[in-house]
Swiss-Prot record:
Protein name as it appears in the record: ATP synthase subunit b 2
UniProt KW keywords: ATP synthesis, Cell inner membrane, Cell membrane, CF(0), Hydrogen ion transport, Ion transport, Membrane, Transmembrane, Transmembrane helix, Transport
CDD domains cross-referenced by the UniProt entry: ATP-synt_Fo_b (cd06503)
Superkingdom per UniProt: Bacteria
UniProt membrane topology term: Single-pass membrane protein
Gene (name only): atpF2
Function comment: F(1)F(0) ATP synthase produces ATP from ADP in the presence of a proton or sodium gradient. F-type ATPases consist of two structural domains, F(1) containing the extramembraneous catalytic core and F(0) containing the membrane proton channel, linked together by a central stalk and a peripheral stalk. During catalysis, ATP synthesis in the catalytic domain of F(1) is coupled via a rotary mechanism of the central stalk subunits to proton translocation. Component of the F(0) channel, it forms part of the peripheral stalk, linking F(1) to F(0). The b'-subunit is a diverged and duplicated form of b found in plants and photosynthetic bacteria.
Record-stated family: Belongs to the ATPase B chain family.
Chain segments annotated as transmembrane: 33-53
Organism for this UniProt entry: Rhodopseudomonas palustris (strain BisA53)
Subcellular localization, as worded in the UniProt entry: Cell inner membrane
Biased amino acid composition, Low complexity: 1-12
Length: 181
């Protein structure tokens, strides 16, 4: 074991100077540049042949999806606009039908009420004419009774006042003149 301690490894250059950092050694620059160029060409080929087409495919698929979604949105907007127009047209037609039904019903009810009113007016006119005839007949009968009663009363009054029974024709003429007068 003593032998392992006696040997030392030399890491430095001769004369106590250290060796330069290997990437900065000028005698290996050319081979490093060639290696770097080969690595960049290989990386470029890999990226351009493998990675970029995949990324481009993803971008194209995304753009196509966006365009398809936009086209679908436009189509659905058109359909919803058509559905809204159809709904508004149906609503307008329903309102017009309801208005027509209301007008027709109102006119029918007004016509029925007018016919009923005319029938009632005719019945009332007939009843009124009958009542007027009855009143006229009753008045005439009452007036004829009044004449008789007035004649009897006048005769009685004259007999009471004068003491003589008056002539019935004269009393009748006097009562008639008074009633007409």
């Amino acid at each position: 074991m003593a032998e392992g301690h006696g040997t030392t490894a030399h890491t430095g250059a001769e004369g106590g100077h250290k060796a330069p950092f290997p990437p900065f050694q000028q005698d290996t620059f050319a081979s490093q540049l060639v290696s770097l160029l080969i690595a960049f060409v290989a990386l470029y080929l890999i990226v351009s042949k493998v990675a970029l087409p995949k990324v481009g495919g993803v971008l194209d698929a995304r753009q196509k999806k966006i365009e398809d979604d936009f086209a679908a949105a436009l189509r659905l907007k058109g359909e919803s606009d058509d559905a809204l127009k159809a709904y508004e047209d149906a609503l307008a037609q329903a309102r017009a039908r309801a208005q027509a039904i209301g007008t027709e019903t109102r006119e029918r009810l007004n016509a029925a009420a007018e016919a009923e009113r005319k029938t009632l007016e005719q019945r009332l006119a007939v009843k009124l004419a009958d009542a007027e005839k009855t009143i006229a007949a009753t008045r005439e009968q009452a007036m004829s009774n009044v004449r008789g009663i007035a004649t009897d009363a006048a005769s009685a009054i004259v007999q009471q006042l004068v003491g003589i029974a008056p002539d019935a024709k004269a009393v009748g003429h006097a009562v008639d003149a008074t009633l007409k007068g």
